[in-house]
Amino acid sequence: MGDFVISGTGGWDWFSIQLDNNTELMLYVLRDRAGATSALFGSFIMPDGTVQDIGPGSARAESTGQWLSPHTGATYPSGWLVELPEQQLVLTVTPQLQDQELYFPGAVFAGPTYWEGAVDVHVSGAGSPTGVGYVELTGYAPPVPSSQ
């Protein structure tokens, strides 16, 4: 994924979700420099291992809140509503902890600053599955300068 940052996109939001009904979702939302979604794609994996491709127009991920980093001053999305119409799923994705930002102040190799962490997932509807996952957010904060 690092090539996306080098090639000039604004960053990405990456979701890896495992539901307790043994289905999984991998979703990538790429953003342009202005912050608009430039691409959205991924895979939905059924319990039998069958993979359903998620392409343009077949999913939506919308932020439901924000978190302001006390470390870098960056504002990150915090909480999401993910809609998968073909799978008839609406997922509410919530960070298990707000402060999961990775930054490297004073490091020889500073690298990009990003947010990545554990999330809880709830599916809309009575008796619907719940799950857990992992979200990675890049492009919301400038890199921390290295010490060299």
Put a short name on every predicted segment.
Residues 1-148:
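Structured soluble/peripheral alpha/beta segments that form catalytic or ligand/cofactor-binding pockets
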